[in-house]
C-alpha cells in the first residue's frame, strides 16, 4: 500500500502513526508523523484535506508565516447557497479590496462537477504577481499568475485573467499582508 498525500497530511494533523491497508490485495504500510508537508504545486486533490482552501492556508503559512484557521467544510457546500469564504473571511483576518497585489485571496464562482454553476462562490486562489514561491526553490517566474487547486485536479499556477477574472466575485487581503509585495 502506498500512502497518498492526503494520508500523509492527515497523519501529521493527528500526530499519531497510521496503518494503511491496500484494498484489494491486503498490502500494508505504516507512516508516522515526520513533518511532511504536501507540495504547493502538483498536489493531489482531496476535499477538506487537500483542496483550494487548504492550498491557501499552506501558502500563507509557508510564504508569509500567517496561520489561517481550518474551517469545517463538507463536500458540495457551495450548492447550499452559503458562501463559506464570505462567512469566514473576516474571522480569518481578511478584508475586501478593489485592487490586486501579490498575496491577495481571489474568490471565484466556477462551474462545479458536471458543469453546473454553484449557488455560492466555491473556489479560491492566491495571486502570485511574479509567480514565484519562496518555498519552492528554482521555480521560474510567471508574471500575472495565481496559485489554485481545482476540484479533482492537481494544484497549479495559471495566468490570472480571462475566465478566472470574469468568475472572480471578491478580492481579499489579509490584515497582516506585507505593505510592499
Locations of regions flagged by a protein language model:
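Active-site-proximal loop/helix of nucleotide/amide-processing enzymes and allied scaffolds
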Residues: 1-34, 41
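Short, Lys/Arg-rich amphipathic segments at extreme N-termini
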Residues: 39-48, 164, 172-175
Amino acid at each position: 500500500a502506498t500512502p497518498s498525500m492526503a494520508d500523509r497530511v492527515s497523519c501529521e494533523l493527528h500526530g499519531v502513526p497510521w496503518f494503511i491497508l491496500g484494498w484489494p490485495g491486503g498490502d500494508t504500510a505504516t507512516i508516522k508523523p515526520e513533518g511532511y508537508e504536501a507540495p504547493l504545486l502538483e498536489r493531489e486533490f482531496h476535499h477538506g484535506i487537500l483542496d483550494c482552501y487548504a492550498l491557501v492556508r499552506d501558502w500563507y503559512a509557508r510564504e508569509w508565516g500567517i496561520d489561517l484557521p481550518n474551517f469545517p467544510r463538507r463536500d458540495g457546500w457551495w450548492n447550499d447557497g452559503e458562501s463559506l469564504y464570505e462567512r469566514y473571511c473576516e474571522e480569518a483576518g481578511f478584508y475586501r479590496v478593489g485592487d490586486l497585489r501579490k498575496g491577495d485571496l481571489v474568490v471565484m464562482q466556477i462551474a462545479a462537477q458536471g458543469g453546473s454553476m454553484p449557488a455560492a462562490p466555491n473556489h479560491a486562489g492566491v495571486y502570485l504577481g511574479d509567480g514565484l514561491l519562496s518555498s519552492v526553490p528554482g521555480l521560474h517566474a510567471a508574471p500575472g499568475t495565481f496559485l489554485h487547486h481545482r476540484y479533482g485536479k492537481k494544484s497549479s499556477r495559471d495566468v490570472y485573467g480571462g475566465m478566472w477574472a470574469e468568475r472572480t466575485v471578491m478580492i481579499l487581503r489579509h490584515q497582516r499582508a506585507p505593505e510592499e509585495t
